[in-house]
UniProtKB/Swiss-Prot annotation:
Designated name of the protein: DNA mismatch repair protein MutH
HAMAP family xref list: MutH
Keyword Hydrolase: yes
Family the UniProt entry places it in: Belongs to the MutH family.
Cell compartments where the protein resides: Cytoplasm
Organism: Vibrio cholerae serotype O1 (strain ATCC 39315 / El Tor Inaba N16961)
Length: 221
């Protein structure tokens, strides 16, 4: 892996240097093998970009470039530049959430400054031939932060009230909460409606595609 960048500008320069390159070219330099597809290697693109950009946090709660206060997010896009899938933000806390505020939340920390890297995501393009797009450094506007905060507070209220099982992907205007587990057996602690501990599937916060589409549209228009 390349050393961690010491400044925001150094990180941006690195991201600009890999724009236009294919996954095959980037994997070759990193000594990584391109998988046939992403079905069993969902995190492969992120790991490839982390190697080239010198990200250190992996999937821990900290930002990928903690010393710079920047999170790295790849975003698969269509031929027309629209996001093809929701963006995972972080795992949702299901216990110990009483008194937790938006200002202290992992979601706010992760989204305070994001380096978005669009990548070609159309399925018919072989993975090795897909290319990386131009990077975009983004922080939420006051309006965007207000939207995120409102959704986060609503979703967390359901968790506090022990209604995690009733939350569906339809809840939340820009932020949604969905099960995040490779299989249905990976259960975690949560609260039931009676306040007693229950076992539940881990949940993750995800940004809806219409929210990320607006970010890309404003920047690349």
């Amino acid at each position: 892996m390349k050393p961690a960048p010491t400044t925001q500008q150094e990180l941006l320069t690195r991201a600009q240097q890999i724009a236009g390159l294919s996954f095959a070219e980037l994997a070759d330099e990193a000594g990584m093998t391109v998988p046939p597809d992403l079905r069993k290697d969902k995190g492969w693109v992120g790991q490839l970009l982390e190697w080239h950009l010198g990200a250190t946090a992996g999937s821990r709660p900290q930002q990928d470039f903690e010393h710079l206060g920047i999170e790295l997010k790849s975003i698969p896009i269509s031929y027309t530049g629209k996001p093809l899938e929701t963006t995972f933000v972080c795992v949702a806390p299901l216990t110990g959430v009483h008194g937790l505020t938006w200002e202290q939340s992992h979601v706010r920390n992760k989204l305070s400054k994001v380096l978005w890297i669009p990548v070609q995501g159309e399925r018919e393009i072989p993975l090795a031939e897909r290319c990386v797009g131009s990077p975009l450094l983004w922080s939420p506007s006051p309006e965007e932060e207000a939207q995120l905060k409102a959704d986060w507070e609503e979703l967390m209220e359901w968790i506090v009230l022990g209604k995690v099982a009733q939350i569906t992907a339809k809840h939340g205007e820009v932020l949604q909460l969905r099960p995040k587990a490779a299989n249905g057996r990976a259960l975690t602690e949560a609260y039931g409606a009676n306040g007693r501990p229950i076992k539940a599937l881990p949940r993750g916060f995800y940004l809806r595609t219409q929210f990320t589409a607006q970010i890309l549209q404003r920047y690349y228009a």
